[in-house]
Amino acid sequence: MKPTPVRRILWVIAILIALGLLMAGLAQAQPVQITDDRGRAVALPRSPQRIVSLLPSLTESVCELEQCHRLVGVDRYSNWPDAVVGKLPKVGGGLDPSIEAIVALKPDVVLLSVSSRASDRLEALGLTVVALEPKTHADVRRVLGVVSDLLGVPRAQGSDRLWRVIDAGVQAAAQSLPPKAKNARVYFEVSRGPYAAGESSFIGESLARLGVRNVVPASLGPFPRLNPEFVVRANPDIIMIGNRSMQAMVPYPGWASMRAIRENRLCVFGPGDSDVVVRPGPR
């Protein structure tokens, strides 16, 4: 029977899909060599198939690169996507992980932050550790590339594609901002203290790309603890509050006099939205 044009198209699609799966499998079977954020070279005979992640942004990066099925354990704060919620063992936090629980999972690699104190102990037990810590927009793009390489996912189909989606989303958000909101002076509180997001933080970069001004200068560091009087003097147009700051919503002295409070210009993020805004990851 002579193939119809429709059948030819279906055959071509099937062949392309098969070739794509073959190439992906070959990439994952190749030796892997990367350098983590400690400057350490990590070499593996093949792409890791069993991964423990101790940092939510790295958990999300693995999943956004469509490799969530390789995760065998995560930290207690990894709560996205649904594929990891209640379905994977929790092995403690990034700073206080259960070494015994991690070892029992027999991971090919453990992903964690540079600041984690678990690196040396895990490596002493013979586990491979990759320490990555995105802190800026540029870091997010770079770390996505490293994770893509580690997973054997070609960057063109993995990290580069994902970054274009992220970047386009930020641009779209900036363009949707009402003209009267441009150059508004914003204070973003990440947790009680108050601890604020400065201009040099990941959040500060996001605010700048949206076209608003951060009242906390870069000279104070990425997440400085401020005297509440500092914020009163800054008198921001808008106050943004992360979920951690809502744990004890006791008014700070003098804040009732601020413009943002008087005019009820408060943006309070719930748990899910707060994670998206605060975590320097692919969401």
Where do the PLM segments sit?
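Short helices/loops that flank or line small-molecule/ion binding pockets
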Residues: 99-107, 125, 226-235
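Bacterial Sec-exported substrate-binding components of ABC uptake systems
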Residues: 2, 15-17, 24-59, 155-187
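A ligand-binding cleft/hinge motif common to bilobed small-molecule-binding domains
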Residues: 116-124, 238-258
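Alpha-helical, coiled-coil/dimerization segments enriched in small aliphatic residues
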Residues: 78, 197-223
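Short helix-initiation/N-cap motifs at beta->coil->alpha
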Residues: 37-39, 89-100, 219-228
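A short, structured surface patch at a secondary-structure boundary
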Residues: 49-105, 109-115, 215
